Design a protein with these regions (language model features):
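Ser/Thr/Pro/Gly-rich low-complexity linker/stalk segments immediately outside membranes or between
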Residues: 33-51
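Contiguous beta-strand segments within globular domains
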Residues: 51-87
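Conserved aromatic beta-strand anchor motif in extracellular beta-sandwich/beta-rich domains
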Residues: 93-97, 140-142
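Solvent-exposed serine/threonine-rich low-complexity stretches and specific carbohydrate-binding patches
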Residues: 102-115, 153-156
C-alpha cells in the first residue's frame, strides 16, 4: 500500500516556487532600474517648459494661456526654452499618451541643435480627426551613451472626452 501524499509538503513547495519567481522578478526590476537610472547620474538640471498651449499647425505657433486641460478637438503643444540648458548635454522631448505610445517629440540632440524646435506638438493618430481622450505626459530627458538617463522636465495634460 502506498504512503499517503502529504498535502502540506506540496503547498510548501508551491509557495517556495512562487517566492523564487517573485525574487527573479524583483531582481529583473532592480537591474532595469539601475540600467535606466544609473547611480550618480543625477545632474540637477531642470528644463524650462514654458507651458502647454493650443497649437495652430498652419502657423506652427501656440496661442492662448498655459493649460493642463484640453478638449478632444483642440490641438496642443509644449513650448520649451532650450537656452536654459547647457549646450553640451544631449536631450530630447517626447509626448506620451495614456497607453505609453510616443505621440510627438524632438531629439535627441543638443540644445543649440534644438533651438529652432521650441514648439513640440502632439500628433493626431493616423486615421483620426481628433486627439484621443486621456492623460498625456510631456517629458524632457537627458541622454548619455544613447540612453535616456535623467528626466529633467515633465508636464501632465488631460484631454477631455
Amino acid at each position: 500500500m502506498a504512503a499517503p501524499v502529504d498535502q502540506v509538503r506540496t503547498l510548501y513547495r508551491t509557495l517556495l516556487l512562487y517566492a523564487a519567481i517573485s525574487l527573479l522578478i524583483l531582481i529583473a526590476g532592480l537591474v532595469e532600474f539601475v540600467y535606466f537610472e544609473p547611480p550618480g547620474h543625477h545632474t540637477g538640471l531642470r528644463a524650462t517648459i514654458v507651458g502647454i498651449y493650443q497649437y495652430d499647425p498652419d502657423q506652427n505657433a501656440v496661442t492662448g494661456p498655459d493649460s493642463s486641460l484640453f478638449p478632444r478637438t483642440a490641438l496642443f503643444a509644449a513650448k520649451v526654452d532650450w537656452s536654459s540648458l547647457p549646450s553640451n548635454v544631449v536631450v530630447d522631448a517626447r509626448w506620451y499618451d495614456s497607453f505609453g505610445n510616443i505621440v510627438g517629440g524632438v531629439g535627441p540632440a543638443t540644445p543649440p541643435e534644438l533651438a529652432d524646435k521650441t514648439i513640440i506638438p502632439v500628433r493626431v493618430p493616423p486615421g483620426f480627426r481628433h486627439i484621443l481622450p486621456g492623460h498625456y505626459l510631456f517629458v524632457v530627458e537627458r541622454y548619455e551613451g544613447g540612453v535616456p538617463v535623467e528626466v529633467i522636465g515633465r508636464r501632465l495634460v488631460q484631454v477631455e472626452r
